[in-house]
Amino acid sequence: MARTVNCVYLNKEAEGLGFQLYPGDLGKRIFDNVSKEAWALWQSKQTMLINEKKLNMMNVEDRKFLEEQMVNFLFEGKDVEIEGYVPQKDDE
């Protein structure tokens, strides 16, 4: 049986993560309050941020920036600002 959480990002009950994917207290908070669906949305935004801003995950400042963006996205309802990115429009 799948574990469910009250996802703070989606604002609904949804399937939770299978295990804690991020270390520390923030990882516990994510595990307890973020759904698989919301985490997948974050991962796509994270990939775009890393690529567009050319972040180096060996650099402490870049990791801190990415963590701040993650908290803003998942818990504070702020969208990720990606310079130069224009969402694809649906053709009607």
UniProtKB/Swiss-Prot annotation:
GO terms for molecular function: iron ion binding. GO terms for biological process: cellular response to oxidative stress. Keywords: Iron. SUPFAM superfamilies: YggX-like. Pfam families: Iron_traffic. Gene3D superfamilies: Fe(II) trafficking protein YggX (1.10.3880.10). It comes from the Bacteria. GO terms for cellular component: cytosol. Could be a mediator in iron transactions between iron acquisition and iron-requiring processes, such as synthesis and/or repair of Fe-S clusters in biosynthetic enzymes. NCBIfam families: PRK05408.1 (NF003817). PANTHER family: FE(2+)-TRAFFICKING PROTEIN-RELATED. Belongs to the Fe(2+)-trafficking protein family. This is Probable Fe(2+)-trafficking protein. It comes from Shewanella pealeana (strain ATCC 700345 / ANG-SQ1). The lineage of its organism: Bacteria, Pseudomonadati, Pseudomonadota, Gammaproteobacteria, Alteromonadales.
